[in-house]
Amino acid sequence: MESFIIEGGRRLKGTITPQGAKNEALEVISATLLTADPVRIQNIPDILDVNNLIKLLAEMGVTVTRHGQGDYTFQAAALNLAYLDSVEFVRKCSSLRGSVLMIGPLLGRFHRATIAKPGGDKIGRRRLDTHFLGFKSLGAVFVKDPQRDTYQLRAEQLKGCYMLLDEASVTGTANVIMAAVKAQGTTTIYHAACEPYIP
């Protein structure tokens, strides 16, 4: 087993600026798909998963402007929804766990989403059931295409409801919230995750 050995005896001094949190960044960046207006986000961490999500959004038609280190503006005014059905999109989503967070905003705003089975790190079970059960409660229907390993979700009009999540999933809660903000009526979520960066 590896370990850290820390030798003290020296007074610590100085200041640091912490990097933004990856999970929060993935959620907030995905939430920019909910509007056609420009959204500026600062303190975005410069890490692979986040950078890959930013590139993926740009390829979908989101206008991405980098103002400086960790400082971006996103404008999802002219999305190419047909790109979601492309082989390239499916391949890229399959290697990026954070891509699942685009489902809620796309379903809420455009009433449809096609997303690959996401990849990324493998901590615990990492199920998608919570996401899909939440979307289903809002009125979405989904079909898995086993040949392409994609999920297609459709909803003419999402409707607010009371729902009990089967687990307090952080990404599941965030995804359902992002879909619910575009739903008709009020949504109340029980057994929601309560991390401080839930949108």
What residues fall within each predicted segment?
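Structural preference for solvent-exposed beta-strand-turn elements
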Residues: 1-199
